[in-house]
């Protein structure tokens, strides 16, 4: 199981690398637009990055669904079916990409990064409470389900907190 997890994690690192340059490219612009209170351009950046991230994720998920088995068979092995694990991992990366946008292009630029410790601590609690059950019930797939659950909870909290901050910024 550890070997399968490691292979899937290595393959998902390729997807993670597709996301990072976008965050780096737009971070300074988002900080600038926030500081100058140029809400139209700030929102445009957030929406465009969000669209690109979703497109990358949907493309990866679709590719994995239709030809993942063949590609994995050519480069890794035909003996192990990694497609299901990769599908959950890719979906998890889509959820994480939303959190990345919230953190790097919204929460940190507006100076509210201190809230992240609390969010991640809560995520760790959720993980500790669910991991053992999920792993025992679903095996290796349970590990991926547990990570998906934790990332979804963290992302939903970030979206909610970002909305609250946004509402307060607009009022001022």
What are these regions (language model features)?
Residues 1, 68-69, 73, 111, ...:
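Membrane-interface helix-loop junctions in multi-pass transport and translocation proteins
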Residues 1-13, 80-83, 143-145:
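Interfacial/gating helices of multi-pass transporter permease domains
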Residues 6-9, 53, 89, 93, ...:
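Residue-level recognition of transmembrane alpha-helices
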Residues 38-61, 119:
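Membrane-water interface segments that mark the loop-to-transmembrane alpha-helix transition
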Residues 91-119:
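Membrane-interface junctions at transmembrane-helix termini in multi-pass inner-membrane proteins
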């Amino acid at each position: 199981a550890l070997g399968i997890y490691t292979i899937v994690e290595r393959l998902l690192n390729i997807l993670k690398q597709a996301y990072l340059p976008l965050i780096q490219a737009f971070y300074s612009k988002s900080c600038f637009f926030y500081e100058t209170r140029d809400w139209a351009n700030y929102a445009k950046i957030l929406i465009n990055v969000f669209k690109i991230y979703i497109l990358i994720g949907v493309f990866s998920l679709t590719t994995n669904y239709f030809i993942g088995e063949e590609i994995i068979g050519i480069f890794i092995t035909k003996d192990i079916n990694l497609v299901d694990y990769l599908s959950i991992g890719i979906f998890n990366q889509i959820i994480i990409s939303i959190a990345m946008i919230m953190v790097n292009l919204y929460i940190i630029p507006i100076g509210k990064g201190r809230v992240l410790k609390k969010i991640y601590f809560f995520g760790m609690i959720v993980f500790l409470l669910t991991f053992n059950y999920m792993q025992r019930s679903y095996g290796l797939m349970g590990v991926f389900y547990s990570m998906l659950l934790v990332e979804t909870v963290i992302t939903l909290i970030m979206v909610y907190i970002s909305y609250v901050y946004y509402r307060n910024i607009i009022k001022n």
